[in-house]
Structure formats: C-alpha cells, structure tokens
A protein has these predicted regions:
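Catalytic-domain carbohydrate-binding cleft regions of carbohydrate-active enzymes
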Residues: 116-629
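Long, structured stretches of catalytic cores involved in phosphate-ester chemistry, encompassing
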Residues: 632
Length: 741
C-alpha cells in the first residue's frame, strides 16, 4: 500500500502510532509547507552488512533515476527490497539491519536484530540535509586532507584542490564522502556531493544541490570488524589493482634541468654510490624554466636537454631506471574512454581518446609511466575519467604491462586503476611532517592505498634542514609512494646535503620560502642515513609487495590506522601520530626538531623493537630514546617478516636467500606473494604463494605452497629462518616443510 509523504499529510494527523520509539520524533518542528514534494524511499540490500538508501522525489507516478558518477563498480545493484511512501511507520529488514522508517520528520532508525541501535538518520526537508549521530568515538575517512585525524568537531566543505585550504601544512584536498564511525558503521554518500558539519553530537550532511531526480543516495554499512567495513567499501567502489613492482621502489624527481649531462649524471651517481633507485621523474617546462618538454601541457621534448629522446630513454633504461614525465591537461573536463574514436580533424582534448592519443608517440619511445598533475577544477566524473585513462590508455599499446600514474586528484574508485596519489605542494616545516601522518591514515581508510608526499616538502622554508629532510625521508620509506620532490631540487637527492649546491632556487613567488645557508650543505650524515632507509625499503619489498597483494583482495591499505587491528583498544583507536605498516610493523615517525626521544603507544599485546630486538609489553605508552638515524619501528609478537637482499633496483637478480624473521610471542601466519612484478600474468595463475605458519607452543615453522599457485624461479628457493639469534637454512621446493626450533 502506497501513500505520498508531504507536510500536508502531517497536518492532517496521519503520523499514527509508532512501532518503536524514535528519539527525534519528539523534536519535530511545528512549521509546515503545504506544497512540499512527496518522497519515495528505496531500500536496496547489497550484502548482509550493507544496504542502499535512496531518497527520490515523486514525479507523478514515477521516481527519477539515480545519476552515475563513475565511483561505483556498477550502476545497478538490483531491485529495491522496499519502496516506501506514506505517513505510517515501516519496519524493514535489510541483511543484518533492521530499519524503522518514520514519516515526520523523515527518520530512519538502524539497529541490529536484537534491537541494538547503530545509527539514526533524519532528513530535513527545509534545509535539504541529512542529520546523523557522531557517537563518542573517532570518525575517520573523508578522503585525503582535512584538518584533523578524528573528523568529529570539523566542518568539511569537501572542496577539491590546493587553493584556499591549508595547503602549506595539510596539502591538497581529495575529498571522498565516505565516513567511518569506529563504533561499527560507515556511510558512503554516492550522490550528490556536499558538506559535512561534524561539530556537534548530531552531524549534518548537506548536499551541494538536489534535483527533481534525486535528493540523496547513500550506502550504509554496519559491522564491528574494521576489516569488514573496508571490504564493504571495496565491494561498492572496487578493489585496488596491483601496481608494477618498480613503483614501490625509490623514485627521484627532478625540476629545472641544465643539460643532458646533468640528467645522466644523476642517474650515474645513484648507481656509482649504490643508492637503490628505480624511477627518475622529470617536471615539465612551465612548472619550471627547463623541464622535459617545451611548455606547459606539451608533448614535445625539450631539445636542449633531450636532443635525442629515444636515445636518452634507452640509456636510462640500460641503467635499469624507469622514466616518468610530468603532464598537465589544459581542459577542465574529460569524458569518454580511450576506446572511443577520435576525429583528429576536430581534436578535442576533453575527449579521453583524443587526449590519450597525444601521449602515444612518447609512450612508444619508452616512457614507463606518467605524472598527471593538477585537475582541481574537474568534476568527479572527469577526475575518474582521467584516472581510468592512465590505466586503460597504456594497455592499448602494452596490453600485458601494468601501468603507472601518479595523480594529484581523484575520487572514490580511483583505486580500481592502481592510481598513486601525493599530497601536493606542501611547505618544508615540522608541522607539515607532523600533519601528514594522520592525513596518510585517513587517505588509506578512504580506499586510496597508494599514497605519498614530496619528501622534504615542496617549498623550502627556514625550517628546511638536513634534520627535517632525514626525518621526512624516514617517514617516506614507510609510505607506499617513496619519492623526493621539491624546489631547490638538488637537496632532494640523498647526497645533496653534502655538495654545497641546492640547485635552482625557484622560490620567488612563495611567501616564507627560504634556501638553507651554504654552511648547512656539507653534512655527510644525510647520505649515510638515507642509504640505511633505502636499503631497508628494498629489503622489505617481499613483505611490502605481499601486503599490497593482500590489499587487492581485502581493500585494506598498507598504511593502516591502529583501529584496523586493535578496535577494542580505545587508546589505539584514537592514536593518529603512528600507524601500522601492513599487519606486523608499527611505525612512529619523528616529527619534532632536535628530538632525543619519541613517545610511542604500543597497542595491547607483545612487541619487538625492530632495531634492538628488545621485547616490550603493549597496552601502554613508552618512551623510546632516539638519535638522528633512528625512527622507532616495532614488530608485533606473532609475526613472520620476509626480507630479501639489498638491491639497486627492484628487478635486479640475486642468488641471496630469502630471510624469514620470526617474532615470537604468539602464533603467526603470513602469505608471501610473488609474481613477475610487471605483467597481468598473475591473473592467469602465474604467481607463487608460500604459506607460512608459526606455532608458538611447539616452536615450529611450517612452509607450504599456496593453493592454486606454483613455484617461480629460482627453484628450489633458498630460505634463511631467523629466531632469537638462531638461524636455519632450508631449500623450499614447493613441498610442505616443518622446522623445529
């Protein structure tokens, strides 16, 4: 039986007796609008944990369609299980949720079957906004950027880009209307875009605009397990794709280029000094006086530096470097796909197929990836079209090679294209470094797993010292994107602080910018410390790559909020100045100038200091003494950490054994994942997985080949197992092995 909701109905007294008490009903307004438009509420069951709630204005006998923006993995999620109109209350079951819908104000109480209330929603027709409860525990998500770790207490206008916002410390803003309540719920506001006011116990989401077709479309998830919440978001917007292995190595960015010799000299120095590096990135002319191309947005090479681009690329490739140039689109819109036809006589840069065609000549020369900058004015659909273009476009010419692109903009769903994201043009200050830890955590919780920052900060300030650079470098070694970039670019290479040369300054247009005094540019410690963290990053690649693979199956980021693994530890949930690196490592970056110690909260359980191997009981804050070369790292008891040899680039061949370090104190398991690192052959079974399990009570380690995988070279595999100073060597052939200690 259908009724039409309107204020006129309310005045006629059609509210009726409530099936359950909804607290907000006692706070109804007395005003009314006789001409209010009737609303139809659609409830669609997505899974046992997630349902869709759509508020659609009635247009005669029908409702408007819900527009698509590209964020969801599909447009249709099946028929609604309920279409509610009318002024009486309605009780609806959607998976594990029980919904009680009341007509005035339009209120929805969401509870479990046992009556435990999860959330209360209320639609305010006067302001066209949705009110919900913030709860008493932290709120996370809302994309990259934002002024605080716990989103409670903030007003978020959800404006994308770098202008008008606290760019200097907080970086660019990539807002995503996905909000997580750590008490066990989350919401993705699919349409339309809007503002979050989280400054009180009752939060408000106000769409930027509503239309005759749609008032609001959201997806609601309820689950006590944080991993389930992340998996449900991935169900809606997609799982991350596997990036190429080389993108997880070190990436060195350049700015103003003096000559061909300078470009080759940087590459040569990395190899001569044996400082691991995989990627060389070149800024475009227009963003600096002399970049890789001739002008902003151009695909023509700068002949003063790259007189023979193909020969130059071949030379860099021969030294095992990947090459990534900076690109800027000159249109504020982008539509279509790379598969569409492009009329070259009517070239339209806003058409993805036409714009991608402009890349293909340089790509054919040997370009390995792209750095698409800017895009702030783009709407959501255009941003996602751009991300998709840099994923699908390269595959037109190299169908079995994983693409790489480093973006400054995106939206929900960008993870489906293995997009990397960085935080924009931040300033070199201690406050910026400090801010980027919670910023990184919320970015990962918003479904963006591949994130990083300009190590050292983009704009140098009087705070830009060797110490700040080192601390930022240490943090960067534990970000998915490990990349140095910024003005005074010669101070961004690991040996730059011992040459006396900061490079072209290029700071004239930045208030508060400054170049370090030349007396500071002879510090030999910097290269030594950078080497330590470069080598550690490369040694940990087996662990990191396995965690990236795990994310493609679960939606979990590599940089993880402590909440994801310790949801019942209130101190861990509210901790925003440290994070988990995968499931085993706890990373506590040093963000204070001249720090001699670092306060670290260790969640409940036992922990091992990575550097000293000292075992410590968690559930408390400790004080870790530090020097300049030490960033506190802890490993969770009950962990198996695979480590490889030091390599100069990710694809370097080595006969050295794989090392498995066991951190005892609890049972442990780990899936080591390997594939060729470049192709999509893993989709067809070309991958190797080694299942590892540690039995704490028996002190035994079991190794076996993962189901549906097979051995990859070298076979047999030499494995060194370490436990409390003891070492055992074993050859793994694919057959199960059990070792005792």
């Amino acid at each position: 039986m259908n009724f039409s909701w309107s204020r006129r109905d309310i005045l006629r007294g059609l509210l009726g007796a409530a099936a359950i008490h909804v607290p907000w009903i006692s706070r109804m307004k007395n005003d009314s609008k006789a001409n209010a438009s009737p609303i139809e509420v659609h409830v669609t069951s997505i899974s046992s944990q997630t349902f869709r709630l759509s508020l659609l204005p009635l247009q005669g006998a029908s409702v408007g369609a819900i527009p698509a923006d590209g964020s969801l993995v599909r447009e249709s999620w099946g028929e609604p299980i309920a279409k509610v109109r009318g002024s009486t209350e309605h009780s609806i079951s959607a998976g594990n949720a029980r919904l009680q819908i009341s007509s005035y104000p339009l209120s929805i109480a969401i509870a479990y079957a046992d009556g435990k209330l999860v959330q209360e929603l209320r639609w305010d027709e006067d302001s066209s906004s949705l009110t919900f409860l913030t709860g008493t525990t932290p709120l996370f998500g809302l994309g990259e950027g934002g002024e605080q770790f716990d989103r409670r207490g903030s007003l978020d206008l959800m404006k994308s880009g770098q202008s008008g916002y606290k760019l200097a410390t907080h970086g660019g803003r990539v807002p995503i209307p996905w909000i997580i309540g750590t008490q066990g719920w989350a919401m993705f506001f699919h349409q339309p875009y809007g503002t979050f006011d989280l400054r009180g116990p009752e939060a408000k989401f106000k769409p930027a605009s509503t239309s005759a077709k749609l008032l609001l479309d959201l997806f609601f998830t309820m689950a006590q397990d944080p991993a389930t919440i992340m998996a449900e978001y991935a169900r809606l917007t997609g799982l991350p794709e596997m990036p190429p292995l080389w993108s997880l190595g070190y990436q060195q960015s350049h700015r103003t280029l003096a000559s061909r010799e300078e470009v080759l000299g940087v590459a040569k120095t990395f190899r001569e000094k044996k400082l691991p590096c995989d990627t060389l990135i070149y800024l475009g002319t227009g963003f600096c006086p002399s970049g890789w191309n001739t002008e902003n947005g151009s695909f023509v090479w700068n002949s003063r530096v790259f007189a023979d681009p193909k020969a130059m690329l071949d030379e860099l490739h021969s030294q095992h470097f990947k090459v990534v140039p900076h690109v800027v689109i000159l249109s504020d819109r982008l539509h279509g796909s790379v598969q569409d036809a492009c009329d070259l006589l009517c070239f339209d840069e806003a058409q993805a197929s036409c714009y991608w065609d402009a890349h293909r000549r340089d790509f054919a020369m040997g370009i390995d990836g792209w750095w698409p900058d800017e895009g702030d004015p783009m709407d959501v659909a255009s941003r996602l079209t751009r991300n998709r273009m840099y994923w699908e476009g390269p595959q037109l010419d190299r169908p079995n090679e994983r693409p790489y692109a480093l973006h400054r903009n995106g939206y929900a769903g960008m993870q489906r294209y293995a997009s990397f994201l960085w935080s924009g043009d931040v300033y070199s200050t201690w406050e910026t470094l400090k801010t980027h830890i919670p910023l990184a955590i919320n970015t990962g919780l918003s479904g963006i797993p591949y994130w990083g920052t300009d190590i050292g900060g983009f704009v140098p300030t009087p705070e830009f010292t060797a110490e700040l650079y080192v601390r930022w470098f240490q943090f960067g070694a534990f970000c998915p994107l490990f990349r140095c970039h910024g003005r005074a670019w010669k101070l961004r290479v690991p040996w730059g602080w011992n040459t006396g040369d900061p490079g072209p300054t290029e700071i004239e247009h930045y208030t508060g910018a400054a170049i370090p005094d030349s007396s500071q540019l002879h510090d030999a410690r910097v290269e030594v410390i950078c080497r330590k963290y470069l080598e550690l990053r490369y040694r940990l690649l087996p662990y990191l790559y396995s965690m990236v693979h795990e994310g493609t199956k679960t939606g979990l980021p590599v940089m993880r909020a402590l909440w994801l693994h310790f949801p019942n530890d209130a101190s861990a949930v509210s901790c925003g100045d440290e994070y988990l690196w995968g499931r085993s490592f706890l990373v506590a970056p040093v963000v204070e100038k001249g720090a001699a110690n670092r306060r670290v909260y260790l969640p409940q359980g036992e922990w091992h200091d990575f550097w000293s191997e000292e075992q410590t009981t968690g559930g408390r804050e400790i004080i870790r003494n530090i020097d300049l070369e030490t960033m506190p790292l802890y490993v969770r008891a009950g962990s198996i950490v695979p480590m490889g040899p030091v390599k100069q680039f990710t694809s370097e061949k080595s006969d050295a054994p794989l090392t498995l370090s066991i951190y005892p104190g609890a049972d442990a398991s780990f899936l080591l994942y390997e594939d060729d690192g470049t192709s999509f052959n893993y989709r067809n079974g070309e991958w190797m997985g080694i299942e590892m399990s540690w039995n704490e009570s028996r002190q035994t380690l079991r190794l076996e080949l993962a189901s549906r995988s097979h051995m990859l070279p070298p076979s047999p595999r030499d494995i060194e197992v370490r436990l409390k100073g003891k070492t055992q060597m074993v050859k793994f052939t694919g057959k199960p092995i059990e070792m005792s200690f």
